[in-house]
Amino acid sequence: MSQDIHLRHSSIRKSSKALAVITAILLVSGLPDAAVANEKKVGKSCNKIGERINLKESYLECRWKSEGKKVYFLLTKIIEDLNPSISPEPYTNCRLPEAIKNRLDGWNSYVSIAYPVVKSTLDPLGSNTYLFIPIDFKDAVGVGSPEKMLRTEVKKIYEWLDWYSNGKVSIQIDYPKSWLRSSKLASELTTWPDLAKPSSPGDKLSGISLVEALLADVEQTYDLSKYQGVYFLPSLAAKSLEHGVFLNNTFKTPKGSFTGGGYIYGNSAFEREEFVWAFIIHDFLHSFGLALHAPGQELPFGIQDTTFGGLGINEWDTMSLGWTNDGDVYCVSKENLKTAEIQLVPIEREQKGTQSIMIKLSDTQVLVIESHRRDKWGMKFLPGFYGVSTYLVDTSVQNDPTKPASKSTRFANYIKNTQTNKDRLVNRRYWQETDAKGNRKSGWVTQPTWDMDYILFENESLVTNGIKITLKKSGHNDLVRIERAQ
């Protein structure tokens, strides 16, 4: 969000209607010719998505519309909270329980896809404590001040958790001012190739043995019993530690044992230009008990599966963690559905209002409709981006990360609109190739990326499961109509 655009919460006193009218008349009458000409561009065609024309109290922004059009949208510089739409049913009616009958084995067997989550190492409701350790090695010396870097990242983690949990969870994160030197050499350790195998690849420590080796160094300075997990951030020079490690386990240490999270930040994420805080939040959400990784399909609509677009949490996962408040969800069962128009708040923005529309289709399926924007928690979206996504949740399906995303391998999937024919979004994309020995090549390329038929622009409709979903009007928020399909 640019610095000249502000979010005004409802607690701020609004100007009287009469004063607003008088002010508007004075402003318009005093506008120079150029400003009047710009005002007339609203709804007219434009060339570059994200282009802005600044006005006195508002601005024009070039955005997509239906039929591939690019037009100017008029947007105010102040964004106010919205009153939530009155939900026909309690949101708990759409909070379907898990209904998996034949559970798959693997790391994802102990995480949850629905409410209530089975708590892992972090409590999704209440207070938690964590230890961040910037760690370096004699053969991979750390550079710079880890305290300076972590201060910024930890602040972001606190802000994200406070907003998306509605203040229902907190984490106290401790970290040292300088690098902690490991007794091991980086060349003795590896996070490659297969962390799921208990045995170490070659003569290097990996997996549980790797975490235990690093915990032994930490235990000399910190009382591990005070923490629910330790997150290691290796020096960038430690090239053998380029892949993340995510383990919730009981680890052996020289002083006994430690039960909790043992994570290693995949420092190749710096090459991918990922935010450190977002990478860690994703891991924390697993530790709260979430399966994540659905809906995904390489679409940039949430921290559950990507760190390249919107970095908010979708309302289904929010609800599964017990973070949802009354008014956050417009819930209705399909048999009770009547035509309605609901104003949605983008999940990437800190704005009060209705966050999601949910339509219960059966005892195991629910449609979820959400709005997206480039905003505080979505700054990796391109300027001018907006849209409404729809995904289907099926609580009888367990994630199977060994197979491509589909209705039978993911509990949630975004729905593609077969009635539109948009281009793929052209954007920078990171690529990497790794051979059998773990040697990596990587870089960036600008090319068509994800399919924009997975989102609705203004005046577009999607028909699915007997429901018609239309984005009637868009601005700072999205006015969505839901009705039975004819």
Describe each region flagged by the PLM.
Residues 4-20:
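Bacterial N-terminal signal peptides that target proteins for export
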Residues 21-31:
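Hydrophobic core
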Residues 34-37:
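Boundary at the C-terminal end of the N-terminal hydrophobic targeting segment
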Residues 82-275, 284, 379, 466-472, ...:
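Zn2+-dependent metallopeptidase catalytic core
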